[in-house]
């Protein structure tokens, strides 16, 4: 074969491939991922909560599919969002510390979409994956700059940050800049309902006296007030979400856009953010995809934050990289039968860049969630529970004073103010959703405990986890 003929065939092949790609792009959906910040699953009306005001999210769920068992890969913003972006665990991609920038060699799904013709971006509250210096530390920023560690300006077409109000403006700017012949992906991040909580946030505030407190909340006036302020911030987010949906509709983009709403991790409430309990990692997840998702559906399949990346790639016709450990939920969206997950995992790491003063800023833990039971491994069990993001609030200081005065129930005093924590915890989520009864060591659940521990050990080994494995030392027979 002559060089001329070879070059001709290569050119024809390239043109055919390009035409096929362009044809596929025309049929590919836009992707809009809207993230609330620190938002636990019970706190949306459509999840059976009759006390919170979220009409836009409730309408959105009626038009799509609600996932009842979706979990963040971490109870902290940075690791959880890193898993969303990469389809991999925070440990596997070295993103267990709150301030870590995403490693240069780790691919994100927006980059893969961009390579296939998508216009991609992030907007609103910070996407959290370019690291932070913390306390204005110039040294850390200098290191980031010298080693070119902050990479998102190069990874995406559009990178903006700010609160949700700015984010809504940035959403419109993003759509204005998008080339007409390209589909888009945008991650739009809200600051709600992240602390701090304040009065007069919602158009119609929630009455603290009328709210039903979770079973693991002490019933005090200040606890009720704090909880009501949290609900108010969710209502404000709901208003903003409605505005975003209207922009999409007004621009004629709603019918070909897969819209996903998710909480990035659990709420900064008691036993929430920063913990591996349900309030820390069990998050709302709703998807709407006209013509592909039958309206009003509910799924009880286990969904991890790692699963969004492969789901989006498959929906857009892009190959899923082998390194992604997430499992695509595309078939679930389409209503096809699936085996589904038996287990998913979450990881707790350092929450700040500086030296810790307790478990709020530095804790290490892992957990495995099964269809019914959850097993938690607290590697730093010697440290007492400390709240993340609300240690200075009036309601927490009031609880401390009540505990010292002996005014808390023995159960709540033990949960929040014991000098240490259990190394291992096992909960029956079906019968004890508030995780108040630790079943570790019980004869009737010994087989479940052993199985979940084995599953977690295997995960940690495969991920090359840096934590000691949850195996007790036996002086006679070695490890057991």
Where are these regions (language model features)?
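Formylglycine-dependent sulfatase
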Residues: 2-425, 433-464, 468-472, 476-480
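C-terminal helical cap and adjacent loop that interface with cofactors, partners, or active-site loops
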Residues: 430
């Amino acid at each position: 074969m002559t060089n001329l003929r070879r070059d001709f065939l290569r050119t024809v092949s390239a043109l055919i491939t390009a035409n096929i790609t362009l044809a596929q792009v025309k049929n590919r959906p836009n992707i809009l991922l809207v993230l609330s910040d620190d938002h636990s699953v019970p706190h949306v009306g459509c999840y059976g909560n009759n006390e919170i005001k979220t009409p836009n999210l409730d309408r959105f769920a009626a038009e799509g599919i609600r996932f009842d068992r979706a979990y963040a890969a971490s109870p902290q913003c940075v690791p959880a969002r890193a898993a969303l972006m990469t389809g991999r665990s925070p440990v596997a991609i070295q993103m267990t510390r709150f301030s870590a920038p995403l490693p240069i060699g780790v691919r994100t799904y927006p980059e893969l979409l961009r390579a296939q013709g998508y216009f991609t971006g992030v907007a609103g509250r910070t996407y959290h994956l370019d690291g932070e210096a913390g306390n204005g530390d110039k040294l850390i920023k200098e290191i980031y700059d010298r080693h070119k560690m902050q990479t998102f300006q190069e990874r995406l077409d559009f990178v903006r940050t700010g609160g949700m109000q700015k984010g809504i403006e940035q959403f419109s700017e993003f759509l204005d800049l998008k080339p007409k012949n390209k589909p888009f992906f945008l991650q739009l991040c809200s600051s709600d309902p992240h602390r701090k909580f304040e009065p007069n946030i919602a158009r119609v505030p929630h009455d603290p006296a009328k709210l039903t407190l979770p079973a693991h909340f002490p019933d005090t006036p200040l606890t009720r007030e704090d909880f009501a302020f949290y609900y108010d911030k969710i209502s404000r987010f709901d208003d903003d979400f409605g505005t975003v949906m209207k922009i999409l509709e007004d621009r004629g983009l709603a019918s070909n856009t897969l819209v996903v709403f998710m909480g990035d991790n659990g709420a900064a409430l008691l036993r929430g953010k920063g913990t591996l309990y349900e309030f820390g990692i069990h998050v709302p997840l709703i998807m709407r995809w006209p013509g592909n998702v039958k309206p009003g559906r509910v799924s009880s399949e286990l969904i991890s934050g790692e699963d969004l990346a492969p789901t989006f790639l498959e929906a857009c016709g892009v190959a899923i990289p082998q390194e992604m450990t997430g499992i695509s939920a595309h078939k679930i969206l389409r209503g096809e039968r699936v085996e589904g997950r038996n287990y998913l995992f979450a990881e707790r790491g350092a929450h700040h860049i500086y030296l810790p003063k307790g478990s709020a800023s530095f804790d290490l833990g892992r957990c495995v969630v099964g269809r019914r039971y959850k097993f938690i491994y607290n590697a730093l069990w010697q440290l007492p529970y400390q709240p993340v993001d609300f240690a200075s609030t009036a309601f927490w200081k009031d609880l401390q004073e009540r505990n010292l005065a002996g005014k808390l129930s023995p159960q709540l005093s033990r949960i929040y103010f014991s000098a240490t924590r259990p190394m291992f915890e096992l909960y029956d989520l079906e019968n004890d959703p508030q995780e108040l009864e630790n079943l570790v060591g019980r004869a009737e659940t010994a087989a479940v405990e052993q199985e979940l521990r084995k599953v977690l050990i295997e995960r940690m080994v495969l991920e090359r986890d840096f934590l000691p494995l949850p195996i007790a030392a036996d002086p006679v027979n070695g490890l057991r």
